[in-house]
């Protein structure tokens, strides 16, 4: 039986198709499979100019593709050589890959270029590997989480790479040297090292130039930057940058020995870290529009809400001030950053010269237990339009700081002459009511100021001070809600070889609701406030005795005669302002007892009734003594 023409034509097509399939080699298979896998990885527009087999290697030439989405990056690759490990599909098994002549370009002008990428021990999808190139910073980010986690490798090496990127609405160039990713396991990198980085403004742009020596990052999760969802991701276990030098925004040179990082985590959210930073880069910081400010605030608020940073530490900073004078910091560290809260901000070893010829060194300056979560919440409200610039700032937006510490401060002239020193100054605050801490304690110790000129000697000689002024001070304030009182439990200033002065007082009528409404309720609170009791105590340490001796000698009088003269003058003055003769005599007697044997003198004022502070202020305008009739007065000497 003869075959029909239609059957003959069908057989010919089948033979040609089968022959074509038989001729296709591993390179063609790999090319087709990689292109087919790209759409699932948010990659598209893929084309391979040529796919050929070269011994045991598959060579793909003139490869183009791009990431998809609202910020696509187009990629051109001259050649991809895959040696070993091909499986007839997109999947690789222990392959060696060399990618040559790579360029990536985004629509906004950001781009990168590298001559060569070498990958050893590649496992997984070739399309996913190429997806790590479809980004503004190859292998630091990826086109998608699926592309970042779609492969593994023993190591990835990039000998050199140049980026053109946007920073604060300006373009800069970053040149990376010898990038190595060791132990890449589906987005997680055991170790990444960079031999050197140089960033500088692109031609015609203003900006800083910065050079960084060796960089090392451990436990880096590159998928954290592109991940969204509901779980917190550890983006970095630790890292460091060595030997940094450059110029500041004011074109002042600086160097930093080392910057190190502790664990960095990214909390879940709808936008990835890469998307957030790209949005921030698009915003002109100098933009005056309301929309620009709102967008900027929103991104910053989200970053601070979602990034948890264990520690950032800077060591060995040397630079200069705006006046060109040297500034150095031995160590600067921020610890415990989480959702607007900071455990501590710490400076040690500050050394700064000033334009007035003085040099200041500070052993340590620390700010501890900072809560700025309310400020971040306000930034979110500003971003979404529920808060506008004309509204009063709510008390919850003011940062809550629990402790400030300053140690070992020394101020000298450049000649070496000391002007003053301080051993320690500490402020501690308790929980707040509105913007006011319910408890505040401040203590200053070891303040020393030398007496350096004739004018100072003339002023301080009557107190017996000729070489130095040494003093300490302490303040403790507490708000007692039940009593509606603000109590100054102590305000004490003590000068060595002179004496100490201590003030204890209270202010009543302070309702919690009015305090919570500050600063808007300041006027109402001022009218409601009432004077409480007050005690002022002086304890002698030689100052009064020296003053009496000094002035008596200058007046050409004996000390006893001079004391009697002071007693008479004091008695006359007290009698003028205190009508109660018995009280006036008691005060005069106590004052005389103190003059005869200076040990201590205490004055206590107790309100005779409710005394509004506003009324007291009016009374005090004429004379301090005009308010005396409002109080019961008690003076005690040497108790």
Model region roles, listed by residue range:
Residues 25-639:
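Glycine-rich, small/hydroxylated-residue low-complexity segments
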Residues 1-24, 605:
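Gram-negative bacterial Sec-dependent N-terminal signal peptides
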């Amino acid at each position: 039986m003869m075959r029909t023409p239609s059957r003959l034509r069908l057989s010919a097509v089948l033979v040609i198709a089968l022959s074509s399939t038989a001729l296709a080699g591993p390179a063609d298979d790999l090319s087709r499979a990689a292109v087919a896998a790209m759409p699932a990885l948010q990659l598209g527009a893929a084309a391979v100019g040529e796919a050929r087999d070269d011994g045991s290697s598959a060579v793909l030439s003139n490869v183009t593709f791009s990431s998809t989405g609202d910020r696509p990056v187009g990629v051109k690759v001259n050649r991809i050589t895959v040696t070993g490990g091909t499986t007839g599909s997109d999947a690789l098994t222990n392959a060696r890959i060399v990618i040559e002549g790579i360029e990536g370009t985004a629509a906004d002008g950001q781009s990168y270029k590298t001559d060569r990428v070498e990958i050893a021990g590649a496992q997984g999808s070739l399309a996913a590997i190429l997806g790590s190139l479809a980004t503004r910073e190859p292998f630091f980010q990826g086109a998608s989480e699926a592309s970042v986690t779609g492969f593994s490798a023993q190591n990835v090496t990039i000998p050199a790479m140049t980026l053109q990127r946007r920073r604060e609405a300006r373009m800069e160039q970053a040149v990376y040297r010898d990038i190595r990713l060791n132990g890449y396991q589906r987005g997680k990198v055991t170790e990444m090292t960079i031999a050197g980085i140089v960033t500088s403004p692109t031609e015609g742009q203003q900006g800083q130039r910065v050079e960084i020596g060796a960089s090392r990052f451990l436990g880096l999760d590159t998928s954290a930057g592109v991940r969204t969802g509901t779980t917190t991701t550890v983006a970095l276990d630790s890292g460091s940058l060595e030997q940094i030098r450059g110029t500041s925004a004011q074109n002042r040179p600086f160097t930093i020995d080392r910057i190190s990082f502790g664990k960095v985590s990214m909390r879940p959210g709808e936008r990835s870290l890469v998307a957030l930073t790209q949005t921030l880069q698009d915003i002109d910081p100098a933009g005056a529009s309301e929309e620009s400010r709102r967008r900027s605030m929103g991104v910053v608020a989200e970053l601070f809400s979602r990034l948890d940073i264990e520690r950032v530490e800077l060591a060995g900073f040397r630079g200069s001030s705006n006046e060109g004078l040297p500034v150095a910091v031995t160590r600067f560290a921020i610890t415990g950053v989480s959702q607007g809260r900071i455990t501590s901000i710490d400076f040690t070893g500050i050394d700064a010269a000033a334009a007035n010829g003085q040099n200041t060194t500070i052993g340590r300056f620390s700010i501890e237990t900072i809560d700025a979560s309310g400020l971040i919440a306000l930034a979110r409200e500003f971003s979404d339009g529920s808060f506008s610039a004309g509204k009063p700032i709510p008390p919850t937006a003011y940062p809550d700081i629990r402790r400030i510490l300053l140690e070992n401060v020394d101020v000298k002239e450049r000649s070496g002459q000391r002007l003053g020193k301080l051993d320690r100054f500490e402020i501690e605050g308790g929980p707040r009511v509105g913007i006011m801490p319910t408890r505040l304690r401040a203590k200053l110790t070891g303040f020393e100021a030398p007496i350096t000129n004739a004018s100072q000697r003339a002023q301080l000689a009557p107190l017996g001070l000729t070489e130095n002024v040494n003093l300490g001070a302490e303040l403790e304030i507490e708000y007692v809600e039940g009593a509606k009182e603000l109590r100054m439990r102590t305000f004490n200033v003590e000068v060595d070889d002179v004496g100490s002065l201590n003030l204890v007082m209270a202010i009543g009528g302070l309702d919690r609701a009015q305090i919570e409404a500050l600063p808007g309720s300041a006027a109402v609170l001022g009218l409601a406030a009432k004077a409480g009791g007050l005690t002022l105590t002086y304890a002698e340490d030689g100052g009064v005795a020296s003053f009496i001796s000094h002035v008596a000698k200058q007046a050409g009088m004996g000390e006893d005669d001079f004391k009697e003269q002071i007693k008479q003058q004091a008695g006359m003055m007290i009698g003028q302002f205190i009508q109660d003769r018995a009280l006036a005599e008691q005060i005069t007697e106590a004052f005389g007892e103190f003059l005869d044997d200076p040990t201590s003198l205490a004055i206590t004022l107790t309100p005779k009734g409710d005394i509004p502070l506003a009324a007291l202020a009016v009374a005090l305008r004429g004379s301090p003594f005009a308010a005396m009739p409002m109080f019961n007065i008690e003076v005690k000497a040497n108790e």
